[in-house]
Amino acid sequence: MILSLLSMNINYNSITSIKQILKERKIAPRKLWGQNYLINESIRQKIIESLDIKENEKIWEIGPGLGAMTDILLKKTNLLTAFEIDLKYSEILNEKFGKLKNFKLIKGDFLKKYPNENKNIDKIFSNLPYNIASKVISKLIEENFLKEMVLTVQKELADRITAKTNSKNYSSFTVLVQSHFTAIKIIDIGENNFYPAPKVKSTTLKLIPKKNNIKDFKEFNKLIRTVFSGRRKKLKNTIINFIKNKAILEENFLKEYLGKRPENISVEEFIQISNNLNAYH
């Protein structure tokens, strides 16, 4: 593998070093874009190891920032495509890695740029900005662009993604993600492992695509959003807003669930309900 250039210029484990480069480039970390730098080397290594990069695999990195993870990834992959929205960080990334044959930088918003890129890739990696994490995951699912992903997100969101049926964190987003991925927690990360320290804990997740038998994704997504909009209500009081033919309420496939709240219905059961409802449309 090709080794990264100028890696000695930034000590990614040192707040002093990071502050220095930010000062030199007149950069102020932006909370909006999740610009918090993971300064714990052992955690960075553990996260990258969980990606389990095989020879010749192509990787996308969303939001590389100063390039701490990029530096490690480039030693493991034949092609890394990095999406960076901040032009000042893009300049730093170009200086550090721009001459490497296995590095490609895309400047701009990932959600706007990725549709135009070659999607023949194997895995996606990101320390996702907390305010857009659910949006990015939802968008990739809606577009049926399902790749193995290792993502660091706000712990609260990770708890929702990995929630079990009958738990307080079980939500429409849980059902959406778990119907398309197997979600595995890799590590919880405390605030002090970042600079600047965020106000919330983080969790790294591994999302592994899995097959499902959803017949109509749009109807499935609409169903779970509708019933979870009244999560404390029983299904009979919320699904009425989704179905057109009220006679369906008498069908056996649905009757057994009408007395349950959405948090008591499993992912597979939601898929079955959606498919059966779809047969009536």
Swiss-Prot record:
Coiled coil: none
Listed GO CC annotations: cytosol
E.C. designation(s): 2.1.1.182
Keywords: Cytoplasm, Methyltransferase, RNA-binding, rRNA processing, S-adenosyl-L-methionine, Transferase
First-level EC class: transferase
Domain of life: Bacteria
Protein's cellular compartments: Cytoplasm
Catalytic activity: adenosine(1518)/adenosine(1519) in 16S rRNA + 4 S-adenosyl-L-methionine = N(6)-dimethyladenosine(1518)/N(6)-dimethyladenosine(1519) in 16S rRNA + 4 S-adenosyl-L-homocysteine + 4 H(+)
Binding positions (S-adenosyl-L-methionine): 36, 38, 63, 84, 109, 127
Main subcellular location: cytoplasm
Known role: Specifically dimethylates two adjacent adenosines (A1518 and A1519) in the loop of a conserved hairpin near the 3'-end of 16S rRNA in the 30S particle. May play a critical role in biogenesis of 30S subunits.
PANTHER family found in the cross-reference section: DIMETHYLADENOSINE TRANSFERASE, DIMETHYLADENOSINE TRANSFERASE-RELATED
Record-stated family: Belongs to the class I-like SAM-binding methyltransferase superfamily. rRNA adenine N(6)-methyltransferase family. RsmA subfamily.
Protein name: Ribosomal RNA small subunit methyltransferase A
